Amino acid sequence: MSLFDFFKTKGSAATATDRLKLILAKERTLNLPYMEEMRKEIIAVIQKYTKSSDIHFKTLDSNQSVETIEVEIILPK
């Protein structure tokens, strides 16, 4: 990453990806009660815009305090 890239604005897809990563990173120690509802809402939004029903959540990397979850979406042709 160069100095010029630092000031470059991100595209909407990159911003959405970063936001989704932040949303899906959950603190294990807190055991947030709304995570399951948030997953359902994310699935509903994805289905609204992609018409896909094949959506899976996967745990990617876990350590003592943070669990990272990946969303896999199979898009119909």
Curated annotation (Swiss-Prot):
A Pfam family in this protein?
Answer: MinE
A biological process from GO: cell division
| Superkingdom of this protein's organism | Bacteria
Identify the InterPro entries for this entry. MinE, MinE_sf
- Record keywords: Cell cycle, Cell division
Functionally, this protein is described as follows: Prevents the cell division inhibition by proteins MinC and MinD at internal division sites while permitting inhibition at polar sites. This ensures cell division at the proper site by restricting the formation of a division septum at the midpoint of the long axis of the cell.
Q: Could you say which protein family the record assigns here? A: Belongs to the MinE family.
Q: What is this protein called?
A: Cell division topological specificity factor
The species this protein was found in:
Helicobacter acinonychis (strain Sheeba)
Q: Which gene encodes it?
A: minE
